[in-house]
Amino acid sequence: MGSNKSKPKDASQRRRSLEPSENVHGAGGAFPASQTPSKPASADGHRGPSAAFVPPAAEPKLFGGFNSSDTVTSPQRAGPLAGGVTTFVALYDYESRTETDLSFKKGERLQIVNNTEGDWWLAHSLSTGQTGYIPSNYVAPSDSIQAEEWYFGKITRRESERLLLNAENPRGTFLVRESETTKGAYCLSVSDFDNAKGLNVKHYKIRKLDSGGFYITSRTQFNSLQQLVAYYSKHADGLCHRLTTVCPTSKPQTQGLAKDAWEIPRESLRLEVKLGQGCFGEVWMGTWNGTTRVAIKTLKPGTMSPEAFLQEAQVMKKLRHEKLVQLYAVVSEEPIYIVTEYMNKGSLLDFLKGETGKYLRLPQLVDMSAQIASGMAYVERMNYVHRDLRAANILVGENLVCKVADFGLARLIEDNEYTARQGAKFPIKWTAPEAALYGRFTIKSDVWSFGILLTELTTKGRVPYPGMVNREVLDQVERGYRMPCPPECPESLHDLMCQCWRKEPEERPTFEYLQAFLEDYFTSTEPQYQPGENL
């Protein structure tokens, strides 16, 4: 298995006669195994075998981050617990970052000293006898299902497929997650391979008996999920393949750098490698407190009011979703520093234009767009507005993970050339006409920008409206001009772009719709897709 933390134990099975209630779905691979060259990624921080996807990108150019809320790439464990549970088990290794943190190893048992609220808990290690703060998303109650390595909790069907459809995963790689459709039920997701479909995923509903047991098919029942996993690890018994390996996943990011590390002193940061430069500042890879790799965005003095920034940052740090860059900490006096998690593949724009871009085909590009739509659907639910959605503000990590960065910052910029929405500093080619002309920025103007971003993806980073200057773009768009379908791009995807570019903002689709459309694109819209020279 990916690790030996929780190998399933042998179990006795209870067999009773009930009506058959088997629910099996096959999910075709959105990433056909033959399409993407694979290269082992760094195993650092992974719970299972190292993932693989595409050739290394060019030098990283920007910064990124991680968070967990609605859907998660790393398993989503339970939050604060009722019932007085105070003994927990570590799911991952953790190295202390401050003098008040507690280092621990995966599998270590920890006694919670204070109540289980917030992102950092005071804990006492039963192994070392030491006490300190721990990240709450790195532990789970002892002897609970959350402590099992194969339990991924509340992740979506699509996210489970994204994890399992890795060319390096052997047949039978699996995870257990909560069912999206049936409350109280679970789902066993298993990777499979056949010559017709290539790499694909099968999903089996795990139903619950009134007596508390579990079954996939009623002829074979179990007292616990642990027994079910142990049994199917030895016998396929109707599954596509016996369970072989726990699905590998990255160690999650902590919520914040440490307990009470929000407004931090400038001296605690070391700027090491300059990654990029823009109109309003620079982006660096650096270290916080001598212990933690971070990305640091430095803003030129005068870019925005420190007071307004701090107020907005309080809102931004509450936006928590795995497809949004989490804001870690700030230096709130000028020059303002914005600290986030470092993401090693840089900006999506550089990624598309770099060496990796030539290997990407439509399935990967559509999946990346679905991830961006997922992050923006969360922004939509939270009644927030991005204002500057484009490939340069999307960040890429291992396995083509995409996250939305720089949300909300554009509103605070005080540069006259920018606030007048004219000139080289303002991203006119990405901006909806009502926002560019009248300053009406809404989630619907973000939808327009998303349509432009889709052209960046399908052209591997080409500047929108090629050959046209900003003023010309504004005039032509007002007269009804819309970009034509990019070469090799299916008409169905261009039609989605045109929906995003409807003149009336309220007629544009929601991000919730865009996410669902793109996640199901190759089953519902383009099931006959065949790879071309570029897409």
UniProtKB/Swiss-Prot annotation:
Coiled coil: none
Segments forming domain SH2: 150-247
CDD domains per record: PTKc_Src, SH2_Src_Src, SH3_Src
Regulation: Phosphorylation by CSK at Tyr-529 inhibits kinase activity. Inhibitory phosphorylation at Tyr-529 is enhanced by heme. Further phosphorylation by CDK1 partially reactivates CSK-inactivated SRC and facilitates complete reactivation by protein tyrosine phosphatase PTPRC. Integrin engagement stimulates kinase activity. Phosphorylation by PTK2/FAK1 enhances kinase activity. Butein and pseudosubstrate-based peptide inhibitors like CIYKYYF act as inhibitors. Phosphorylation at Tyr-418 increases kinase activity.
Membrane topology annotation: Lipid-anchor
Function summary: Non-receptor protein tyrosine kinase which is activated following engagement of many different classes of cellular receptors including immune response receptors, integrins and other adhesion receptors, receptor protein tyrosine kinases, G protein-coupled receptors as well as cytokine receptors. Participates in signaling pathways that control a diverse spectrum of biological activities including gene transcription, immune response, cell adhesion, cell cycle progression, apoptosis, migration, and transformation.
Assembly and binders: Part of a complex comprised of PTPRA, BCAR1, BCAR3 (via SH2 domain) and SRC; the formation of the complex is dependent on integrin mediated-tyrosine phosphorylation of PTPRA. Interacts with CDCP1, TGFB1I1 and TOM1L2. Interacts with DDEF1/ASAP1 via its SH3 domain. Interacts with CCPG1. Interacts with the cytoplasmic domain of MUC1, phosphorylates it and increases binding of MUC1 with beta-catenin. Interacts with RALGPS1 via its SH3 domain. Interacts with CAV2 (tyrosine phosphorylated form).
SH3 domain ranges (all copies): 83-144
Lineage: Eukaryota, Metazoa, Chordata, Craniata, Vertebrata
A single GO BP: regulation of early endosome to late endosome transport
The protein's name in its UniProt record: Proto-oncogene tyrosine-protein kinase Src
Chain ranges of the Protein kinase domain: 269-522
